[in-house]
Curated annotation (Swiss-Prot):
Active site: 286 (proton acceptor), 350, 403 (nucleophile)
Pathway(s): Protein modification; lipoprotein biosynthesis (N-acyl transfer)
InterPro entries for the chain: Apolipo_AcylTrfase, C-N_Hydrolase, C-N_Hydrolase_sf, LNT_N
Primary site of residence: membrane
Annotated EC: 2.3.1.269
Gene Ontology, cellular component aspect: plasma membrane
Spans traversing the lipid bilayer: 8-28, 66-86, 105-125, 178-198, 203-223, 505-525
UniProt name for this protein: Apolipoprotein N-acyltransferase
HAMAP family: Lnt (MF_01148)
Pfam families hit by this protein: CN_hydrolase, LNT_N
Membrane topology recorded in Swiss-Prot or TrEMBL: Multi-pass membrane protein
Amino acid sequence: MERLAGRVMLAGGMSRAVMAIAAGAVGALALPPFGFFAALFFSFTLLVWLVDGCTGKPGGGLFSRILPAFGIGWCFGFGYFVAGLWWLGNALLLEADEFAWALPLAILGLPALLALFYGFAVAAANLLWSDGLGRIAALAAAFGVSEWLRSFLATGFPWNAIGYGIMPIPIMMQSAHLLGLLSITTLAVFIFASPALIGTKKGMGPGLALAGLLLAAHFGYGFYRLQTPAETPADALTVRIVQPAIDQSRKMLNTDRAEIFAEHLRLSALPPGEGKKRPDIIVWPETSVPFILTQNPDALAEIASTLEDGQVLFTGAVRMEDQGAGRPPRYYNSVYAIDSQGEIIGATDKVHLTPFGEYVPFEGILREFGIDNVIALPGGFSAASSRTPLTLPSGKTFYPLICYEIIFPGEMTPGLQGAAAILNVTNDGWFGDTPGPYQHFLQARVRAVETGVPVIRGANTGISAVIDPYGRIIAGLDYGRVGILDATLSGGSNDAFTYDTHRTYFWLIFSILMIVAVFPALSFARRQN
């Protein structure tokens, strides 16, 4: 291992960039649909050795060392995000004649921007670099902060945070309930980078022992927590999720709107399976209603005739808000609650819009510079200022998250407290049967664990599921299947944690790692001088 580490450290020029890109790309194997978490041991071990070789030019000063480290981190991130997000380009192929020009932006441009976070993380860690365990702690702390920044800067896009790589199955998800995603990400980097100590020997014993203990605790806590079955309340609701698997190209045709609506009604009216209760609530996916529902009373009447007495439909739909004479209306990506009388008894709008999918960031600036191609990308939705929990006549509430809102742990506001479930409606049909829907589904499962609240996930093409507060699938429909699932909704876990608690733990872990990193770095700097 020492010889291999030495060869990596001494590699120069283009070979270093290629190795960093390859290390990041291999790390994406830890993500769905593969879930091979051990790949990240290779990735971060190689990354540490590459940074070990960032010595800078003699007399070149601080930046001569930081810039090569930034480059290695950027290349690592570029490989990771290209391998993990290439499927985004599939959405542009649905209207290839109009948007094929944007494929390089989706497949290479977005990863190039996201890689900046990892570039800055490695550059920051390099400021505290040493020749032992301290550098592993510095790298973990820096990656934790970079993922925190990625979750909110420029609207935020925390998709495929490193922490998801160490949570492929429920037994490995439970630590997220105790610590939260950011803490898991930080500790995961420490664990995955620790084998690099074998190549340099210094700090190897304590480092590997600590990493081993953390990994054992990760599995052990998961095993312990999964011994508790999810409780089913006496007044538990039965949920039906409708998965019509409407091809996205068909949803975009005006001619098929009536047939699409009829398909949702048909699936909703199917009798429950043998031994199943009649559903109390029915869930349709994001933007299931292919027209403005409030302008179509006949559609509401058809919904009323389909629902049995006491049933409530939650459906994704586009909501239009009239702005008055001379002003264009606003459109919102919404969820309606509709009772068996065809009355809309609740509604909520999407708060966190998808950039370039539901709106174009900096549209005014782009228009001033004459960049019309980007402005022509799909969009046109307005963002709500807050989300409204949906309440049944019985008083039970559901916390709505539309599409990728569920990937943001910070979206879990106090309105989640006391909710019967998180209601997540989405349409992953844009991306086809690629890794995208599977990655999205994993993040929904982790939110259930993190919050201790079950998740009802209705997806047009899948994966639809009812998920218990431990991330286990009570019932599900695979990607691409047409059908329904009926399931009894479990209760939440009794040991709920809040996002504020998780955030406190993250900064505590960050502080401990910084202490571990700073003292060896000071000693290392003195020896070098």
